[in-house]
């Protein structure tokens, strides 16, 4: 599979194989990016129709990667409304709208294009504006957080979304260094605020940039909404696939899939179920999938990726 110059799709082969039993005809790519996953799916499943969603205008500007691709500029936190509108097409008013999608795919996080474009402000390795907005039309940018928010709020973001143990120390340094003029300045302030032993490990700004980016884009809130919508609108026998890149996202996906897979809670000596609980999901693979060494040799950025899948068993 050729690499996409905009964004190299992670575990595209695994995604295709997990969807072969479904033979999807209608699928949502909730994180279109440059269309890497969509391209692989269109090649694998002739006749497939894809609803391709992305909030980044740069991604939408790439255009559809093939026939049958319907582009929607939106955050996947709005997926419930988007799916309802599509599933209701051709259905009379007042009629119950059944789930109509065969699969949903989420590739969570920042794209290669966003990291490599210094003007987007996502990378601590490149000098650019302190921005980090995936949707450039959004009001909140990273500059507001680092240059206007109080210490306590910044520290909360770094701890909550970056799991940064030195959150308060770093937050105080950021406030003291104001105005933070660009991403290189922010990365330098963070590096200088931590002990030398910490600097000798991974770059100390890594978790800080992750945390601020998640806060700016409300990534976890959007994931929660998008995941619920996907489970609601995928048909029985259809699948929901999620590729995540850090523990916060993965824990959310793991817990939701586990909760959906829980069935009857009655004591084992009950002759019949009285709780009425029925599992809505099951996992067709025992363990989450990770990139192969061959893929990592071509795309080292995929190293932290985790792919989970759940299949709908009931409405």
Could you describe each region identified by the protein language model?
Residues 1-315:
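S-adenosyl-L-methionine-dependent methyltransferase catalytic core, i.e., the SAM/SAH-binding region
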């Amino acid at each position: 599979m050729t690499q996409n110059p905009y964004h190299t799709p992670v575990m595209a082969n695994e995604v295709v194989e997990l969807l072969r039993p479904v033979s999807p005809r209608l699928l949502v790519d909730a994180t279109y990016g440059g269309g890497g996953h969509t391209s692989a799916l269109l090649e694998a499943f002739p006749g497939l129709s894809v609803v391709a969603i992305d909030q980044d205008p740069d991604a939408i500007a790439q255009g559809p990667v093939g026939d049958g691709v319907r582009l929607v500029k939106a955050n996947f936190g709005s997926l419930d409304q988007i799916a309802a509108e599509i599933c209701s097409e051709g259905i009379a008013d007042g009629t119950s709208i059944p789930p109509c999608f065969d699969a949903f795919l989420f590739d969570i996080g920042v794209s290669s294009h966003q990291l490599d474009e210094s003007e987007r402000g996502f990378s601590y390795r490149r000098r650019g504006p302190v921005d980090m907005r995936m949707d450039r039309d959004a009001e909140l940018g990273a500059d507001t957080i680092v240059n206007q928010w109080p210490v306590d709020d910044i520290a909360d973001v770094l701890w909550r979304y970056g799991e940064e143990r030195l959150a308060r120390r770093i937050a105080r340094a950021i406030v003291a260094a104001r105005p933070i003029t660009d991403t290189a300045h922010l990365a330098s302030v963070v590096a200088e605020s931590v002990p030398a032993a910490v600097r000798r490990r991974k770059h100390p700004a890594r978790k800080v940039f992750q945390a601020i980016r998640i806060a700016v884009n409300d990534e976890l809130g959007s994931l929660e909404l998008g995941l619920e919508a996907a489970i609601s609108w995928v048909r029985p026998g259809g699948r929901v696939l999620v590729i995540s890149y850090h523990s916060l996202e993965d824990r959310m996906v793991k817990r939701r899939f586990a909760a959906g897979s829980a069935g009857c809670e009655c004591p084992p000596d009950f002759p019949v179920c009285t709780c009425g609980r029925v599992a809505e999901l099951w996992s067709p693979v025992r363990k989450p999938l990770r990139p192969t060494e061959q893929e990592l040799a071509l795309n080292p950025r995929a190293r932290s990726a985790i792919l989970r899948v759940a299949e709908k068993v009931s409405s």
